[in-house]
A protein has these predicted regions:
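A structural signal for well-ordered alpha-helical segments within the folded catalytic domains
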Residues: 34-37, 82, 86, 173-181
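Catalytic core and acceptor-binding pocket of nucleotide-sugar-dependent glycosyltransferases
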Residues: 147-267, 273-276
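N-terminal anchoring/stem segment of glycosyltransferases
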Residues: 1-80, 93-98
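A structural signal for short, well-ordered beta-strand segments and their strand-loop junctions
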Residues: 4, 53-55, 102-105, 110, ...
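Residue-level signal for well-ordered alpha-helical scaffold segments within enzymatic catalytic domains
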Residues: 45, 90, 181-182
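A generic structural signal for well-ordered coil/turn residues at beta-strand boundaries
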Residues: 135-136, 239
Length: 277
């Protein structure tokens, strides 16, 4: 069974948040509750035997969300700090969830059955890499929680805390730049300056701190990035499992959801006609 575990918590701004959080929530007013609703619907559309578990704080209750929650008290933490903390505790504590895990945000849509991301593949953790040769953790995939996997995530949390003052944009990018730092150090891919510039990641499998880490393409079939060019006409590709709506792509989230929902319903009707007596 696939466990999709998106993180989301309401921003209260009693703690200083990243400028991007202020921009998305207060200025652009992106509707993360509605994103979650669409993500949930598309997940169960293709994965009826799977389970979606919202990772959040003790007080967030998204509108129209009736599923289960994994809650941690992160009232003293920013949203990115909370995300990293929840991901760490989810993997490292005994929560009864120990295999076929996809951790993500809410601004995503599912496009097909997700179990093939795990089947007949030898890895512990999958991490997406952008074409600019940096980590984008739109999704982090864990095949099975082992002791080494737990130690990897504990170390990642330690580095997230210890490196917090090394980057002025850590309050927004720190969750994924921590992965970058660990990978660069372990694979001896050290950039000349911080924050990390381009460096030669090669997709494939690597041994990192006792774990088999598989680097996959951000924008590829497993972790797709919705493409708004050319002329905003592109739809979903049938062989792409998961679509991320990064940055300005969020403006196309709901129209894409409606378009793909209609396509799905038309396809179902065609299939029903073919099998009808």
């Amino acid at each position: 069974m696939v466990h999709l575990i998106p993180f989301y918590k309401d921003a209260n701004f009693k703690i200083k948040e990243a400028p991007e959080i202020i921009d998305f929530v207060k200025k652009k007013r992106y509707d993360y509750h509605k994103y979650l609703e669409c993500l949930t619907e598309t997940f169960y559309r293709y994965n009826p035997e799977g389970k979606l578990l919202l990772s959040t704080d003790m007080t967030t209750n998204p509108v129209n969300y009736q599923g289960e929650c994994y809650r941690q008290d992160t009232s003293d933490k920013t949203i990115i700090q909370s995300k990293v903390y929840n991901e760490t505790r989810l993997i490292c504590d005994d929560n009864g969830i120990d295999e076929n895990i996809i951790m993500c945000g809410t601004d995503h849509l599912i496009n097909r059955k997700l179990d093939k991301i795990f089947l007949n593949q030898d890895f512990d953790i999958k991490i997406p890499i952008r074409k600019t040769a940096r980590v984008n953790n739109a999704m982090i995939v864990v095949k099975k929680v082992t002791d080494n996997v737990k130690r990897f995530f504990e170390y990642r949390y330690e580095r997230f805390i210890s490196d917090e003052d090394s980057d002025p944009h850590w309050d927004w990018y720190g969750d994924q730049r921590t992965y970058d730092k660990i990978l660069r150090e372990e694979l001896n891919l050290l950039p000349v300056r911080e924050p990390p510039q381009k460096f030669p990641y090669q997709l494939g499998s690597y041994e990192v701190r006792g774990c088999k880490i598989k680097l996959i393409e951000y924008g590829g079939n497993e972790c797709g990035s919705f493409d708004i060019w050319p002329n905003h006409r592109r739809g979903f590709e049938d062989n792409t499992y998961f679509y991320d709506f990064k940055g300005k792509r969020k403006e196309y989230f709901f129209s894409s959801y409606e378009k793909e929902r209609r396509n799905y319903e038309r396809q179902r009707k065609k299939e029903d006609i073919r099998v009808s007596p």
